[in-house]
Amino acid sequence: FEGAIFVPRYLVSAFEATVDRENDVLASVVNKTARYRGGNNNADWDGTYKSLLGVPASSLSLTAFRDKARKLGADWGCYDWNVHTDIFWLYAIEYATLNSQKAFNPDLDAAGFRQGGLGAGVSDFNNWNAYNETYPFIPCGHTLSLGNKTGVVAFTLNAEQAVAYGSEHTEYVPSYRGIENPFGHIWKWTDGFLARGTMEYQEVYISRDRKQYSSTLNDSYIDMGHDAAANGYVKSILATTQSLSQTLRVYGDLIPTDDTGSATTYYTDYHYTAHEEGTIYGALLGGSAND
């Protein structure tokens, strides 16, 4: 229909990615062997409460994540800005809210529609730095029991972990239609988004051609305008800006233009920005375990 765009079929990994250390490629697996050790691949922590076996990889650049994915084939990639945007709007339509962190409610409302949200996610692990220096700690596949259903699964620290953390603690790990931790736990690099600092704001560029994704600007990256100049809670996004052409707005890109919202109004999410002159920035999405 008029104004619509076709979104081609793609696959999204069920879990946050780790690295196959033997072949140096990304892998979305439930596996606690050294071959798939997550975090920064620190073997010294094996057998301790801080073990990185079975958790996603971290401490890698966007370029490194992309390169490790592309070793699997030209059509493979790391987490994707355009995919994330699609997932967000599918959620927003299904749950009729922009706040994905509303309390989870498995029941439909009286009219047969979804209600609530996906819960707070893994976002209140307040002693994270002291616990394990902010490395991942939620095992890949923790929500596997849900299959492709949306829900949350409790993750409770064992006795040794609780001593290290300083108290007993439980996090509730969300899965949206089979995609584990769509937000929270660890910040996620998202490919296809680049921005150039101007000292005042970021000039934002988006690529729709996954085979052209890069860490430097190329001809596939489209100038989308600029983001909000300061940190703050998102009130409006570029996709709702009437001055932007409909051909660009139709993708629904979640680029903040007004950061005067709050934690309970509008988009309810926080936007961090930096804009040093000439610096090229990527996008980290989803928040982290202590935020």
Where are these regions (language model features)?
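Short aromatic-cysteine micro-motif
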Residues: 1-182
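C-terminal, surface-exposed recognition/capping segments
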Residues: 83-85, 107-140, 144-149, 157-159, ...
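A short, polar/charged loop-to-alpha-helix boundary motif
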Residues: 196-208
